[in-house]
Amino acid sequence: MRLKDKVILVTASTRGIGLAIVRKCAQEGAVVYMAARDMERAQEVANTLDGVKCVYNDATKPETFSSMVADVVKDAGHIDVLVNNFGTSNPGKDLDFANTGPQIFLDSVNLNLRSVFMASQAAAKHMACHGGGSIINISSVGGHVPDISQVAYGTSKAAINYLTKLIAVQEARHRIRCNAVLPGMTATEAVEKHLSDDFRNLFLRHIPLGRMGLPEEIAEAVCYFASDASAYTTGQILTVSGGFGLATPVYGDLVNKAVRR
């Protein structure tokens, strides 16, 4: 098992990608701590998995980041890996640059970016005194390939990519690695809820592999960065998107239409 006896803290982990990460890490032998605001839901999940425990964290309350890390250290003695899975978007409100309100922008920055900064800072202070560790940020392909909408979400995720590299450089002296995983369109409950058939078909046209990703596939990438197999890897931005963003199919379509004329 790749992660045997590693202590791994996963934030925002009761559903979707976060839950898939918890399950995969547990399967690989890790002792996993689910950080969540809904402790009842977290405990229900933990009860179904071996080696999984719960700690409280509310991303809207800055004081809970240091207490979250302290709770894990008190129980396990140390933290080997932090997985920052914070992320929120505001469909229908997070629009283009000209039409997104300042509060929507600040909400995304606070939850998506500030949370990663504060959780990473709290964990790194501990890791620096205990031989190092690995910080893994779940960003988004939306922070790598600019969109025509979701200016707040995309900007916050792009900043996480920068922060990942900065942490990697500045904390290397403490043997702390930091990498990011950028999921593309992933088949979670939240995505399926807001995805119309028309939009699904349109989006799939722009994914070379022709399908949405699975939460378990994102979890596999996380396990790599959490494992000793990536001991010499830091500051990397790994896109797991089925090839989305590699090409410009819209441009190709326009060229073909022009030629046909």
Predicted regions, residues:
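Residue(s) in the substrate-gating loop at a strand-loop-helix junction
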Residues: 140
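Substrate-binding pocket helix/loop in short-chain dehydrogenase/reductase
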Residues: 93-97, 101-106, 203
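Short, small/polar-rich loop/turn modules that mediate ligand/substrate recognition or access, typified
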Residues: 172, 177, 233-235
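Conserved glycine-rich cofactor-binding loop
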Residues: 12-15
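Active-site helix of classical SDR
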Residues: 120, 156-159, 164
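Alpha-helical segment proximal to the catalytic Tyr-Lys
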Residues: 125, 169-170, 231
